[in-house]
Regions:
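C-terminal lobe and adjacent flexible extensions of AdoMet/dcAdoMet transferase-like proteins
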Residues: 100, 261, 278-361
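A short glycine-rich, Lys/Arg-flanked "PGG" loop and its adjoining helix->strand segment in the class I
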Residues: 197-212, 227
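N-terminal chloroplast transit peptides
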Residues: 1-15
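Hydrophobic beta-strand segment of the Class I
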Residues: 183-189
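Class I SAM-dependent methyltransferase Rossmann-like catalytic core
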Residues: 24-107
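Class I SAM-dependent methyltransferase SAM/SAH-binding core
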Residues: 97-183, 197-201
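A short His-aromatic
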Residues: 191-193
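Conserved catalytic/acceptor-binding region of the Class I
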Residues: 214-282, 290-303
Length: 361
């Protein structure tokens, strides 16, 4: 019985060629990119500030034209424009205390991110001088904020204080001031600078040798209550979360940022300021009227009222006070750093000590 198996002829196998592989390589001699990483949408931030000024002016005009109710006084022009200045004024007062603690009062000061001049106004009392000064111009919204109260006595900076609304210092107007001021101060403006080290480096260039920088920036756990509530609500309704609150500086990173910018004898301290609001809606309205809304690049245009309603309920449930209000935490990072100079105290050379530490202890 023959087998049913068939014997196939031998086939000549062709050699299999290896598949090509592609690699992304970087020449080690290639210099790093020079453009700074952009975090914030600066045109949107200027637009937010301009709208905030317009909105407050309209509010002031509407209240000024309305008939005051019985027992109410007609709102003044100054009060109408300073409805939401409470936060900047509080931060500026705390920053002015640190400026007043300097052993030698600086003879020339530049106030960056001056907003409507809150810090400049407070420094008038510290410096006891009332000679009119000058201001720099950068950004329409910042210019409008700086000269918001120009018809009143609110803006009258001393000659040694130069108020500037700019957050970034890469502008021709500030070039002549390099190494010509003894102190640079900034109250609540550095959080909108994407390249913190680059901005602080330019601040150092403004200072004379042995000059000092004193600044306050929001960071850390600022608005953590609202951030948590929005994330929980958006995760529940949308199935994902987006950046609804601008990124903040970590207090533990602040000393290294100052050192990388070239400052010495760096001092960093943090203070938490808690403000109670009737609800999350009033908090968001005040942030909008301050011009401090989210301005991160690539943010979603809308959030949805359903998410906001859910976030407001979560806010009240998780963080609400017994009286029905909700707290909002603002973590203020105070920075003090000195530009290197010949008169600064320096550590002695290693091994130059004349007595052992164990003898002292």
């Amino acid at each position: 019985m023959r087998s049913a198996l068939r014997v196939l002829p031998k086939r000549r196998l062709s050699p299999r060629l290896p598949q090509p592989r592609f690699y992304a390589t970087l020449n080690p001699n290639t210099p790093p990119p020079t453009a700074a990483y952009q975090v914030f949408d600066e045109p949107s931030k200027d637009l937010q500030r301009s709208r905030a000024i317009i909105r407050l002016r309209e509010l002031q005009a509407a209240k000024a034209n309305a008939e005051p109710a019985q027992g109410e006084s007609q709102i003044s022009a100054e009060d109408g424009l300073r409805v939401v200045d409470y936060l900047r004024e509080e931060v500026s007062e705390r920053l002015a205390e640190r400026i007043g603690d300097l052993r030698v009062p600086p003879s020339s000061i530049m106030d960056l991110s001056a907003h409507a001049g809150q810090l400049t106004q407070i420094l008038q009392d510290v410096l006891a001088d009332e000679v009119p000064g000058q201001g720099q111009n950068e950004g329409q919204g910042r210019q409008e904020a700086l000269y918001r109260d120009q018809d009143s006595c609110f803006i009258s900076p001393p000659e040694r204080i130069q108020a500037s609304p700019s957050d970034l210092l890469a502008h021709p107007e500030i070039e002549p001031l390099k190494e010509q001021v003894e102190a640079v101060v900034s109250s609540g403006g550095l959080q909108w600078v994407g390249d913190i080290v680059g901005g602080l480096t330019q601040v150092r260039h403004l200072l004379k040798p042995d000059g000092v920088f004193v600044g306050a920036v929001f960071g850390g756990d600022t608005l953590f209550e609202m951030r948590t509530s929005l994330q929980l609500a958006e995760q529940e309704i949308r199935g994902g979360i987006a950046n609804r609150v601008s990124p903040m500086i970590n207090p533990t990173d602040a000393p290294s940022l100052m050192n990388r910018a070239g400052f010495t004898s760096v001092t960093v301290d943090v203070e938490d300021l808690t403000i109670n609001y009737p609800s999350m809606w009033e908090l968001m309205a005040d942030l909008r009227d301050m011009g401090e809304s989210n301005a991160i690049l690539g943010r979603r245009a809308t959030i949805g009222r359903d998410v906001l309603v859910a976030a407001s309920s979560i806010y009240q449930e998780l963080f609400g006070n017994e009286d029905g209000t909700v707290p909002a935490t603002f973590s203020i990072i105070f920075l003090i750093g000195w530009k290197p100079g010949p008169n600064q105290p320096k550590p002695s050379k290693r091994g130059s000590g004349q007595s052992a530490l164990q003898d002292v202890l």
